Amino acid sequence: NIANYDYGAYAEPIDPESAWGVSLIRFGVDDILNTSDLIDEDGNIDYSRISKFSTADYGFTFSYARKLKVPGFQYGVNAKIIRRVIGDFANSWGFGFDVGLQFERNGWNYGLMLRDITTTYNVWNINEDEFDKLPEIGGIVQDLPQSTEITLPKAQIGISKQFDFHYDYGLLVAMNLNMEFTKTNDYIATDFVSVAPALGFQFDYTKVVFLRAGFGNFQNEVQLDNSESFSFQ
């Protein structure tokens, strides 16, 4: 695998109506070859000057969830700290909040999640000495990247239904609408909001063995001749 994904979590109830939890996520690519020092001062290629570095995103999340007094309703809140590291070249710290609401009735589950509701900010610290080692590309001098990265709020609406069959078989069907408040190349896109539908299935046997499949990432891809082509994954 090119990328590594690691996850750990802990949760426990506070009382019969609420619970809290913490989680740690790492998503990174390790052992990337750094060839910025490949050529020595005399213009000779020296492979011993190649080093390796990792780029990784870390997410620490504190979560709280509670059932509401209205039957079937429950909500949750995430407070998250984000750490991003690109070798010795740059690193950043960020923070943000997510909120979610769920409703269950007659075996149907409905959900609304607002991600990065306050806008998530990542403030970068860039190693200018390492950046200056990068060569010019096509005679163009590279500008130092901006030090603040902004993640705008997103919304996600979902619905699911569990179907149980004879002999311990079950099927969970779910559909999501993932919304970004900007224009993208999603199949449904306006100047105000872009919507990416997703459909998923989960087959289970005795709630022990699970098999998942799904469709998503519906987009209008721009081809080499500037025409658009519909695609999905």
Positions of PLM-derived features:
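Subset of outer-membrane beta-barrel
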Residues: 1-233
